[in-house]
């Protein structure tokens, strides 16, 4: 999304959010408030979507569920109207993760499927890999192991077409773990062992520096 047409002050706020997200929650929220206040004055949906999304993401990291839902829910129409589809898919992903953590699996699946729809429609392959992995993990939790395999294999296919992404081996490891679990719980022990060996090699490829739970991937 191109923000170059904005004033230097707004660009400074936007850059501040990018630099501080995930490391300085207080500063990120302050900058998002600046952006949001300005965007309301200007009736600017692009900036409103951006500010609400990154506020919601920050509250996710702070484990403030009410503010997370409030901000991300506000972000959805603005992100849709301003065509910020990458952030829109990520917003649905966070809503799904949080719903699952609260024990509301049906809502989680609805959010994931919305995210997946945007990824397919707008060719958001990197986010699409994450979403398919997360859906596969959710189906494993349901005990629907064939469905889990279906989505994990789709994640694998997408990943093989996008080998240049920095998270390649991290995603591959999560896929192998998910497929291994699917096979194990179906008593397909030889296949489960093969995925376990692949996962072990994956840890070696990444020297152990792996984000090993895709439900935390944003």
Stretches found by the model and what they are:
Residues 33-40, 73-83, 113-123, 153-164, ...:
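Amphipathic alpha-helical segments of tetratricopeptide repeats
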Residues 7-8, 46, 86, 126, ...:
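Residue signature of alpha-solenoid helical repeat architecture, marking inter-repeat boundaries
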Residues 11, 50, 90, 130, ...:
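Residue register of alpha-helical TPR repeats
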């Amino acid at each position: 999304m191109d923000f170059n047409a904005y004033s230097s002050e707004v660009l400074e706020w936007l850059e501040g959010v990018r630099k501080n997200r995930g490391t300085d929650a207080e500063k990120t929220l302050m900058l998002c408030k600046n952006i949001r206040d300005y965007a309301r004055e200007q009736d600017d949906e692009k900036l409103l979507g951006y500010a609400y999304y990154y506020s919601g993401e920050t509250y996710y990291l702070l484990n403030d569920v009410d503010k997370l839902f409030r901000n991300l829910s506000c972000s959805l129409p603005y992100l849709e109207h301003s065509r910020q589809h990458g952030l829109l898919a990520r917003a649905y992903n966070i809503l799904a993760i949080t719903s699952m953590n609260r024990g509301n699996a049906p809502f989680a699946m609805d959010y994931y499927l919305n995210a997946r729809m945007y990824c397919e429609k707008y060719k958001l392959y990197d986010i699409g890999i994450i979403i398919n992995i997360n859906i596969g993990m959710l189906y494993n939790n349901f005990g629907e192991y064939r469905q889990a395999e279906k989505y994990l294999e789709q994640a694998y296919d997408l990943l093989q077409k996008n080998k240049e992404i920095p998270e390649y081996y991290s995603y591959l490891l999560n896929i192998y773990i998910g497929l291994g679990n699917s096979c194990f719980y179906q008593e397909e022990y030889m296949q489960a062992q093969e995925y376990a060996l692949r996962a072990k090699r994956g840890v070696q490829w990444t020297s152990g520096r792996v984000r090993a739970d895709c439900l935390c991937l944003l």
